[in-house]
């Protein structure tokens, strides 16, 4: 079975990319357990709790990330450099537990996957 990586690199609620990526991730988890989630660039904002998407008439899907554990999705990585560049502390309480990795280590980890889907 191929190993699949889901990379979230866009801000939440500006487009449907984050919501569609999360839907695809949860659906794929029913087919394989060889997957991981990566949050890079503006995708780190997907991890923040307390967002108010209703102010831009968007659906609040961020809380759904909390289901990753129920779906046995345990490999979650976040780019430490992306957090720093956006003024976010790696010790912040995110909606899902994600391990911070520096960019070079994150690239090495991502290289272990056969398929990379970016949202």
UniProtKB/Swiss-Prot annotation:
Superkingdom of source: Bacteria
Gene3D superfamilies: DsrEFH-like
A GO BP entry: tRNA processing
A Pfam family hit: DsrE
Biological classification of the source: Bacteria, Pseudomonadati, Pseudomonadota, Gammaproteobacteria, Enterobacterales
Assembly with partners or alone: Heterohexamer, formed by a dimer of trimers. The hexameric TusBCD complex contains 2 copies each of TusB, TusC and TusD. The TusBCD complex interacts with TusE.
HAMAP family, per the entry: Thiourid_synth_C (MF_00389)
Membership in a protein family: Belongs to the DsrF/TusC family.
A GO-annotated cellular component: cytoplasm
Cellular localization per UniProt: Cytoplasm
UniProt keyword terms in alphabetical order: Cytoplasm, tRNA processing
Name the record gives this protein: Protein TusC
Function in brief: Part of a sulfur-relay system required for 2-thiolation of 5-methylaminomethyl-2-thiouridine (mnm(5)s(2)U) at tRNA wobble positions.
Disulfide bonds: none
Chief location bin: cytoplasm
């Amino acid at each position: 079975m191929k190993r699949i990586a889901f990379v979230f690199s866009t801000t939440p609620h500006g487009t449907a990319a984050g919501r569609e990526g999360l839907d695809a991730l949860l659906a794929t988890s029913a087919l394989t357990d060889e997957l991981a989630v990566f949050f890079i660039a503006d995708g780190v904002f997907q991890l923040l709790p307390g967002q108010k998407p209703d102010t831009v008439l968007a659906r609040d899907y961020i809380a759904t990330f909390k289901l990753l554990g129920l779906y046995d999705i345990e490999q979650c990585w976040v780019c430490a450099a992306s957090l720093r560049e956006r003024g976010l502390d790696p010790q912040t309480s995110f909606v899902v537990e994600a391990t911070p990795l520096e960019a070079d280590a994150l690239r090495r980890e991502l290289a272990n996957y056969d398929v990379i889907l970016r949202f």
